[in-house]
Amino acid sequence: YPPKPESPGEDASPEEMNKYLTALRHYINLVTRQRY
């Protein structure tokens, strides 16, 4: 499995949060595609 994206934390900027959510969505897609 690819490594899970690191959460930027509570004090993250909107840009960091956006980047994290995009990476997380990509990660979930990879994981679920491998599983099924």
UniProtKB/Swiss-Prot annotation:
Q: Which GO terms describe its molecular function?
A: neuropeptide hormone activity; neuropeptide Y receptor binding
Going by the UniProt record, its keywords in alphabetical order are:
Amidation, Antibiotic, Antimicrobial, Fungicide, Hormone, Secreted
Origin superkingdom: Eukaryota
Q: Which residues carry this modification: Tyrosine amide?
A: Y36
Q: Name one GO biological process term.
A: defense response to fungus
Cell location: Secreted
Alphabetical list of SMART domains matching this protein: PAH
A cellular component annotation (GO) from this entry: extracellular space
What tissues harbor this protein? Skin.
The answer to keyword Zinc-finger applying to this record is no
Matching entries from Pfam families are given as: Hormone_3
Family membership, please give it: Belongs to the NPY family.
Q: What does this protein do?
A: Shows a broad spectrum of antibacterial activity against Gram-positive and Gram-negative bacteria, yeast and fungi.
Q: What is this protein called?
A: Skin peptide tyrosine-tyrosine
